[in-house]
């Protein structure tokens, strides 16, 4: 993987303490933002499920992957390490949107499909577990280096 190299010891010594420059923290920051968005999406999907019988309710969703892809796509000819290190994580805000499509199974205008929502929720839970596992792995690698 491109982010296995975590630490580069800087040649500067400030006050007797060597400073460490690391892209590992950049990855952890992005993974943390992604995990936060995944957790938020789980809550939104659960809310959709709880409103399956609410007349006129329109499903909501969250688009974090699109925002991340857009931010990473700004520097097309750079390595992933470089893109991540230059990424402004404050711009990685998940966008919650309401699905106003006219497609609905029911006469009451509710557009929540319980089967789709359950599949999306299960998928999001797996994604969240993978993200938190990745964050934990990053810290384990840093700990072993130190």
Give, region by region, the residue ranges found by the protein language model.
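Amphipathic alpha-helical polymerization modules
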Residues: 14-146
